Amino acid sequence: MQAAYRNNYRNTRKGLKYFIAIILLLNYFFISAQTDSVRPGKSIITDSGLLSRQHDTAFLRRQEDLIDIFLKIIRKDPAIRFEKNKSENLHIHFSGAPSPSYSLATGIAFNVTGSFAFYVSEDMKTNISSVLLSPIITAKQQLVVPLQFSIWTKDNKFNIQGDWRFLKYPEDTYGLGGTTTDADAVQLDYDQIRLYTFVLKTLGKNFYAGLGYQYDNHWNIAQLGVPPNTVTDFDKYGFNSSSISSGISADVLLDTRTNSINPEAGSTYANIVFRQNLQALGSDANWSSLLIDARKYFRLSDRSDNILAIWSYNWLTVSGKPPYMDLPSTGWDAYSNTGRGYVQSRFRAKNMIDLETEYRFGIMRNGLLGGVVFANAQTYSETAGNLLKPIIPGWGAGLRIKFNKFSKTNICLDYGFGLHGSNGLFVNLGEVF
C-alpha cells in the first residue's frame, strides 16, 4: 500500500508540475494577442536569441522571468538559454501560437499569431525586420485580420512599414465630444479595410523621414437598436452606410529608444504625421489631419532604475470634414492604448488631445515582478479653440510580470478607472508606451 501511495504521490506531483507549466504558457499566450506593432523599432519578436546581443550576461543571469520558471518546472537548466544564444541562427526566426485574449471592446477573444523575423544583411548592423499575421475572433462576433510589417534595408537606409487590416467590427459608439454618457451608446455594425504603408529614409542618427499612403474603407455601416424618430450624433454629423478616406502622408520620426518594448530612461520618441486625403485618390472628400505623438522617459534617481514615462498623443483635424468612422477616438491609436479607464471608442470628435503619465517601479530584485501607477487626461472638441473643455481623467495601477528578460518584455496587467463608474482590465505584452 505504501508503494502505491508513493506512486500516486509521484504521479500527482508530476501532473501538478505540468499543469503549472501549461498555466504559465497560457498566461503568455493570453497576453501575446495584445501586441500590436506598426511603427519602426517596436519588435513583434520576444525570443531571447534575437534581442540579447547588447545585454550584459552577468546581469541577465541574476534576473528571472517566466521562461526561467517554466524551465525549472520541467527540470531544465535556465542556463541553456545562454548557450542557445551562442549557437542559434540569428538571421531567421519564425514563431506561431494560438492564444486567448481579452479587452473591454472585444471581451474574450481567440487568435492565431504567426510572426516571422529576419535580417536582410549578414553584417549584423541592420535592424531586425518583422512580419506579423494575427487573425482574431471575439465573443462579440468581431473578426480582425491584421497584417503588419517593418522591413529594414541594408545598413538601415530605408524602413518600409505596413499596417494592413480587415475588420468586421460591431462596437458601441457614444456620440461626439467629451460630455457623452453611457446612456448615449449606440451599437454600430461595420466592415473595414485599412491599408497604411510608409517608406522612411534614415537622415541621421535616430532620425527618419518619408512618405506614405493611408487608405480606410468602411462599408455595411449600420446603427442597431435605435428607437424610431431618434436622431443620433452620427445622424447629425452625417450618417452614411459607407465611407472611403484615401490620401498621402508625410512622416517625420525621432526615436532614440534602443528597446521600444520597454524603453530605457533618457530615451525620446517623437513622431509627426500629416495626412492629406484627396478625392483624386478615391477619397469621398478632401480633408487633412495631423498626428503628433511624443514620449519621454526619465530616471528620477541615480540609485533606482524606476522610470517616469510621459506620453502626449494629439490627433487633430486640420481641414475638411472626416467621415464619422475616421474621427479621432479613444483607443484608436496604433496600439489601442490611449485612455486606459475607458472602453475603445468611448469618446470621439474632430480633435483629440491625450496626455498620459506612468511611474514604473520594481518589486522583486530579480526583476520578475514590478508595478506601475498611471494617470491620463483626454479632451475632445469640434474646434481647436475648445480643446480643454472638458478634461476627462483616467487613473489606475498595474502589475508587471517579466516574461522575457533578454528583451525586457513584461506582461502588463493594468486596472483602470474613469468618470461615472467606468473601469476595466487592460492587458498588453510590452509596455503601454
Predicted features along the sequence, with ranges:
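Bacterial Sec-dependent N-terminal signal peptides
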Residues: 1-39, 298
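Gram-negative/organellar outer-membrane beta-barrel architecture
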Residues: 36, 86-96, 100-244, 249, ...
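C-terminal outer-membrane beta-barrel translocator/porin domains of Gram-negative envelope proteins
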Residues: 258-364, 369
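C-terminal hydrophobic structural anchor segments
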Residues: 360-394
